[in-house]
C-alpha cells in the first residue's frame, strides 16, 4: 500500500479574525482543486503577559499589565494534486499571518 502524501500547514497570528480568514481561503482553494482537507484545527493560544512599572522612581504599586496572544491553526491537505500545489503557491494571504508548510 502506497503512503499518502500530506501537506501540513501551520498558521500563526496575533489577530484571530485574520487567521480564521486565511484558513478559510486555504480550505476553499484546496477543496476547489479537488483535495481532501482536514481542519482547520485550533491549537492552544499562547498568552504572554508583561507587567511594567509606571512610575520611574517610587510607587511600586502603580503597574500596567499587557498581554500578547498568539493564535495557531493546523490543517492537513491529504493527497494534493499538482493543481492544488500550484493554487496554494499563488495564494496571497494577509500580512499578519505566519505560514509554515511541511510535506510528509
UniProtKB/Swiss-Prot annotation:
Involved in the binding of tRNA to the ribosomes. Pfam families: Ribosomal_S10 (PF00338). InterPro entries: Ribosomal_uS10, Ribosomal_uS10_CS, Ribosomal_uS10_dom, Ribosomal_uS10_dom_sf. Part of the 30S ribosomal subunit. It comes from the Bacteria. The gene is rpsJ. Belongs to the universal ribosomal protein uS10 family. GO terms for cellular component: ribonucleoprotein complex; ribosome. SUPFAM superfamilies: Ribosomal protein S10. Keywords: Ribonucleoprotein, Ribosomal protein. GO terms for biological process: translation. This is Small ribosomal subunit protein uS10. GO terms for molecular function: structural constituent of ribosome; tRNA binding. PROSITE patterns: RIBOSOMAL_S10.
